[in-house]
């Protein structure tokens, strides 16, 4: 579906509201189409800037969502404001009632052992009638073997889900979807990041005031300091000067 995009360091970030997004997905499913959805925080945008393959995936993806206040702020600084910040943590809880209302089926792929099953149980209790038709946890590897990859494809295709939720961390999940979507019997494939654990109640989300103030990253760091240190204190500080450079390069006409 067509929508406006905003260039953030070479990544075309989608500018649309949550309602517009779900309306689009309903059409995609009903018309038997396919769509790749990438949820892109700052570290994914930086990964795309550094890696041509990742940037190509984001340019070809159907939706590249604004996951994080810094990305929204950057669009405003560049005077091309994105309509709405749409994070994986906001999208995931809305998917289940959306699926119930439309009679759509869901498959959960990824996360650590036990997480997807817990999420399935929690959502089946919370949303009677939700059809979570399968879960699969692949081994923890940088690159899957051909056999492992085929097992994942076979598990998904056996149940033909309308919505495929992939939790392999970004940009790994986005690469996997891009490389395999043509082989998958599904319609909307979403790289959802670490949202499974939060939606399942295994990890708490930041208070609303911290989300609004752009401090959700700090709350996540306090919960998982070892895993998040590089993302927030090594990679993220590079983002601001690059955005400033992009703005003034545009002004001067430099590429």
Name these PLM-found stretches.
Residues 137-144, 185-223:
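Short, flexible loop segments at boundaries between secondary-structure elements
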Residues 41-45, 168-173, 195-196:
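Short glycine-rich anion-binding loops that position phosphate/pyrophosphate groups of nucleotides
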Residues 85-86, 93, 133, 183-195:
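Short, acidic/small-residue loops that bind anionic groups at enzyme active sites
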């Amino acid at each position: 579906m067509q929508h406006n995009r905003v260039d953030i360091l070479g990544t075309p970030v989608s500018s649309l509201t949550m309602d517009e997004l779900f309306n689009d997905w309903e059409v995609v499913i009903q018309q038997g189409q396919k769509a790749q959805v990438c949820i892109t925080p700052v570290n994914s945008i930086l990964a795309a800037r550094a890696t041509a393959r990742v940037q190509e995936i984001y340019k070809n993806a159907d939706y590249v969502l604004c996951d994080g206040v810094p990305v929204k702020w950057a669009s405003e600084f560049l005077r091309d404001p994105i309509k709405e910040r749409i994070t994986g943590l906001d999208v995931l809880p809305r998917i289940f009632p959306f699926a119930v209302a439309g009679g759509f089926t869901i498959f959960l792929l990824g996360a650590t052992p036990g997480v997807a099953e817990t999420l399935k149980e929690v959502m089946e209790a919370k949303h009677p009638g939700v059809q979570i038709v399968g879960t699969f946890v692949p081994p923890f590897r940088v690159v899957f073997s051909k056999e492992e990859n085929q097992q994942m494809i076979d598990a998904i295709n056996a149940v033909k889900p309308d919505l495929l939720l992939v939790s392999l961390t970004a940009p790994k999940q986005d690469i996997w979807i891009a490389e395999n979507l043509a082989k998958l019997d599904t319609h909307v494939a979403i790289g959802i990041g670490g949202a499974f654990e939060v939606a399942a109640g295994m990890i708490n989300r930041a208070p609303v005031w911290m989300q609004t103030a752009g401090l959700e990253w700090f709350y996540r760091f306090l919960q998982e300091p070892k895993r998040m240190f590089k993302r927030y204190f090594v990679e993220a500080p590079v983002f601001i000067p690059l955005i400033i450079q992009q703005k003034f390069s545009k002004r001067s006409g430099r590429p």
